[in-house]
Amino acid sequence: DMATLFVKAFNTYPWNEEWTFEQAFTRIDEIMSARVSRGYVVYDGDTVVAMACGRIMTYIDFKELWIDEFSVNPLYQGKGVGSKLIEFIRNELKKEKSKISYLALNTERDYPCVSFYENNGFSASETNLVMFANVDYKGNN
């Protein structure tokens, strides 16, 4: 299922993270729990080999699909599965009642996936910056 694929994809190179099935399931469930959530899955027989999930969000006068998670089974990477999934997503979004203008996502700089996304029509924003802050931050005192 999606959580199993998530663990396979993100616990290997280049991410080398340490997800458990339960953590992955919870993350996907959280993403998919809203009215604006969308999920897409590619199967090879009974096996999930690629998936994307995210949310359709309004930004001023247009909508965009923010892809929160996108993963392809490492054994299927480089075989066009991910590109076909993105093409499928674009076609599905064209069927939505409201026009969806953009696909958007965050990823790590200098990772192999950057060229994959660029080859599928994504480009890096020159103006946007993702920032994080620890909840326990107490200021510069």
Protein language model features and the residues they cover:
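Conserved GNAT-fold acetyl-CoA-binding loop/helix
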Residues: 7-29, 37
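A short, well-structured alpha-helix characteristic of acyl/acetyltransferase catalytic modules
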Residues: 1-13, 140-141
